[in-house]
């Protein structure tokens, strides 16, 4: 400005100069004078800075909740938990999983050292309790989850045994006394288990039917196993699902429809009644029907005709089927007459949906199964186990199946349970599975897919920044977590990653010394993130904004001012 206070440069010229500067230089220039300060806060200037700095596609609009481009730039720059503030070294082996309590006051960690540790989440994190599971013949702990009122902790682990053993167990721990309340068998161990209600949990069991055919049974268990009467259940069978081609059900979780932003159900039963299960195939442009619409109506005649065609073809030498392919074909045909179709139900936002990984072509989990849980199924009350078994419907049909054409290595729900985020390592385009025991090779890049559980559609392009290197038969789970604005995941490249959910951009890489297995946002404070690694550490990360607040010098308390009359009286001559 000149001496008279008038600007020497018009605002438009200052604006053009500021466009050529980076964000830090714009803010520094804004300290020179009032004119530059006003221009440095211009909305159009910060819109341009935002798209250029974060490399967001121009057709992506500003976040609906944002009030200005400047504040939105600041949110992504200053409020992402990317500053390491604490490293926890109490575990002595690889740390596999982290989970927060719903209040955010505590979190739990599982490790190859076979302990479940419970931590106090204060400004400085401290260890509250450590439960050693080796006396129960566990090899290691792998997963944990707090119940809704944070009074109980579900801990899942793997039994000691031969390398090919798939048995595990779920333990329920009281968070008041840290007493072990109950133990439930869980097979295969990577079902993990989950809470359905505050006092009931879901576990799995596996029954072999053939070499590559099996049946997964999902059980509802009471967390308190005291038996008051022989006529009262502590366990109840939820679903029985057929597995083909060496596949099994794994990674169960529950989505609560009542937490959706709108009252629409994930599955509108009034529209879907009578329709077969549908496969939403991400590898093609159309939806393909999973079953022939006439299968349920043709009954045993259809099954007999199908079996006769298969066997005649084999005997005549026309069908060159391997033993595995023949077993799968026969199992499919036999199941058609013994599978109960999905139950119809009036729209009810109290319903919950069981979500899990599965498959139909190979043992590699390449599909997401979704099964509606009706209100009457959410309790162990009902006929005592063994009663009411007269139906021919041996298996339960799924309500939805989503095929991702890749190996699923992680899943997580958004806080409102509407969006499902999936870590997947893709198969090569056009892959054909000829042998269920030899799935296609998987990509080193991990795709983070997003599905809207209201519409059963993929809603975002895949996020890709993190990597994994292990082959199919050694592939392990990479746990992810979702907060209000961010999604985070571990990776095998020794980093954790954070993306913005709206803009689909990677915001931070969080360094470890080995594979990052799990991440967890505080449910009450998304500017705090925990990461767990094979380097046997847990790291706590906070946003730059929170770090500044915590490190700011606290002013000394001033002497309490005396009232004017008291001050005046003491100074009278």
Curated annotation (Swiss-Prot):
Its main location: cytoplasm. Coiled coil: none annotated. Disulfide bonds: none annotated. This is F-box/WD repeat-containing protein 5. The modification Phosphoserine is found at residue 151. GO terms for cellular component: Cul4-RING E3 ubiquitin ligase complex; cytoplasm; SCF ubiquitin ligase complex. SUPFAM superfamilies: F-box domain, WD40 repeat-like. GO terms for biological process: proteasome-mediated ubiquitin-dependent protein catabolic process; protein ubiquitination; regulation of centrosome duplication; regulation of mitotic nuclear division; SCF-dependent proteasomal ubiquitin-dependent protein catabolic process. Phosphorylated at Ser-151 by PLK4 during the G1/S transition, leading to inhibit its ability to ubiquitinate SASS6. The gene is Fbxw5. A motif (D-box) lies at residues 308-316. It holds the Pfam family WD40. Residues 3-49 form the F-box domain. GO terms for molecular function: protein kinase binding. Belongs to the FBXW5 family.
